[in-house]
From Swiss-Prot:
Its EC number is 2.5.1.54. The lineage of its organism: Eukaryota, Viridiplantae, Streptophyta, Embryophyta, Tracheophyta. One of its GO terms (molecular function) is 3-deoxy-7-phosphoheptulonate synthase activity. It catalyses: D-erythrose 4-phosphate + phosphoenolpyruvate + H2O = 7-phospho-2-dehydro-3-deoxy-D-arabino-heptonate + phosphate. This is Phospho-2-dehydro-3-deoxyheptonate aldolase 2, chloroplastic. Pathway: Metabolic intermediate biosynthesis; chorismate biosynthesis; chorismate from D-erythrose 4-phosphate and phosphoenolpyruvate: step 1/7. InterPro entries: Aldolase_TIM, DAHP_synth_2. One of its GO terms (cellular component) is plasma membrane. GO terms for biological process: amino acid biosynthetic process; aromatic amino acid family biosynthetic process; chorismate biosynthetic process. Its main location: plastid. Gene3D superfamilies: Aldolase class I (3.20.20.70). It is found in: Plastid, Chloroplast.
Length: 507
């Protein structure tokens, strides 16, 4: 969490005495499978019977990890990382878990967004500020429409590593290892760039620290004050339909603040001058995550201090796999990415492994499966989880199930398909009597042309003009804000008790 004020749960005690892992040399020993990788053959009791440790994941089969050429170099880098200060604090992660527990009960809504993959080359203050600013705008829109607290979580300050469906990439007859994210190897298509370099982990750490430092300054230094709500519009959205709608909403907020001032209610309260902001990323590069895991002296629990929240991806969520083994032992709030391939009983077992105490806010299920599959598959998942008595926060990721190849060869996503999946997500929760707890978006504050559609009608022919992503296509600022208004309208309908009625506009 970014805000640090008098109401923060971070005492002096929780700042200082993190207990680091024992100071023996970190060994990135080869990992191997001791159980079948078939999720259906694993059970919660089998996993729970094995004592967890920082290195217990190494006894499991680990997918999506790079093959480093020099093991001694890797060990040296990991030892250095293990001596570095934590990027985030345990008390912040606990507070996020409490907030997500509210979202699980329909009392809050999570807005999670940011880059598909952060890069070293595009790292600068303006890009960080612009993405943060769009998230602030979206948060205001959602809060105003839903009359709910909005939990703002960035895919920032650590979202580097990316899973790959193929370990190799081929161009013009040349076959090289796939690009796996800037914290592992380079994206340039040459042999040297594609060799995994452990020193990139150190650079990823320093960039994450610098990013979070800037976010903390923006969140607490007055930039995020509600009184600035009308000043957050980006230049290229000001003269658009979404810019006009946002300006109208901002004026209404300004009027409300003016009324509060006239009534003698102070606007100097921290809730009006600062914002809470958390960070998250996919837990993929396990050696890095282990090196940044600390034992919290106030609770005795282990926290992965690389981010407030981590999630396990579709390709690494095997019940008996290394990633699930690592995550079950850390106390951070966790996300589970779920596609149409997820079997209800498997999801229940995975939640049992990761949250045996059934703590609200511990597990967020991030659903990504396309609109048609959403209507067929999600009800069964909700019923299975409810039948098991498990408490989770349901979140829609309308991005990953809607990636297509444009005629020109660029990956893209259709705004209409994204909206359709969100509509299906809300419809299913209305039907099942459950709570839509949030949205997870790949987006940027930059004026890119990577997703087609939206009110500005980006076409296939427009894609190449400002296509800057290192990985998957992202919503630009205008499209992100447009989506926020659509979601806010649906939240408003739920608030007014008419969420089950068909909508003529929006979702």
């Amino acid at each position: 969490m970014v805000t640090l004020n008098a109401s923060s749960p971070l005492t002096t005690k929780s700042f200082l005495p993190y207990r680091h892992a024992p100071r023996r040399p970190i060994s990135f020993s080869p990992v191997f499978a001791v159980h079948s990788t078939d999720p259906k053959k694993s059970t919660q009791s089998a996993s729970a019977s094995v004592k967890w440790s920082l290195e217990s994941w190494k006894s499991k089969k680990a997918l999506q990890l790079p093959d480093y050429p020099d093991q001694k170099d890797v060990d040296s880098v990991l030892q250095t990382l293990s001596s570095f200060p934590p990027i985030v604090f345990a008390g912040e992660a606990r507070k996020l878990e409490d907030k997500l527990g509210q979202a699980a009960m329909g009392q809050a809504f999570m807005l999670q967004g940011g880059d598909c993959a952060e890069s070293f080359k595009e790292f600068n203050a303006n890009n960080i500020r612009d993405t943060f600013r769009v998230l602030l705008q979206m948060g205001v829109v959602l809060m105003f429409g839903g009359q709910l607290p909005v939990i703002k979580v960035g895919r920032m300050a650590g979202q580097f590593a990316k899973p790959r469906s193929d370990p190799f990439e081929e161009k013009d007859g040349v076959k090289l290892p796939s690009y796996r994210g800037d914290n592992i190897n380079g994206d340039a298509f040459d042999e040297k760039s594609r060799i995994p370099d452990p020193h990139r982990m150190v650079r990823a750490y320093t960039q994450s620290v610098a990013t979070l430092n800037l976010l903390r300054a923006f969140a607490t230094g007055g930039y995020a004050a509600m009184q600035r709500v009308s000043q957050w519009n980006l230049d290229f959205t000001q003269h658009s339909e979404q810019g006009d709608r946002y300006r109208e909403l901002a004026n209404r907020v300004d009027e409300a603040l003016g009324f509060m001032g006239a009534a003698g209610l102070t606007s100097a309260h921290p809730i009006m001058t600062t914002t809470e902001f958390w960070t998250s990323h996919e837990c993929l590069l396990l050696p890095y995550e282990q090196a940044l895991t600390r034992e919290d002296s106030t609770s005795g629990l282990y926290y992965d201090c690389s981010a407030h929240m981590l999630w396990v991806g579709e390709r690494t969520r095997q019940l008996d796999g290394a990633h699930v083994e690592f995550l079950r032992g850390i106390a951070n709030p966790l996300g589970i990415k779920v596609s149409d391939k997820m079997v209800p009983s498997e999801l229940v077992k995975l939640i049992e492994i990761l949250n045996p105490q059934n703590k609200p806010g511990r597990i967020t299920v991030i659903v990504r499966m396309g609109a048609e599959n959403m209507r067929v598959k999600l009800p069964n998942l909700i019923r299975a989880v409810r039948g098991a008595g498990q408490i989770v926060t349901w979140v829609s990721d309308p991005m990953h199930g809607n990636t297509i190849m444009a005629p020109g060869g660029l990956k893209t996503r259709s705004f209409d398909a994204i909206r359709a999946e969100l509509r299906a997500f809300f419809d299913v929760h209305d039907q099942e009597g459950s709570f839509p707890g949030g949205v997870h978006l790949e987006m940027t504050g930059q004026n890119v042309t990577e997703c087609v559609g939206g009110s500005r009608t980006i076409t296939y022919n427009d894609l190449s003009s400002r296509y800057h992503t290192h990985c998957d296509p992202r919503l630009n600022a205008s499209q992100s804000l447009e989506l926020a208004f659509i979601i806010a309208e649906r939240l408003r309908k739920r608030r007014l008790g008419s969420g089950n009625l068909p909508s003529s506009i929006g979702v």
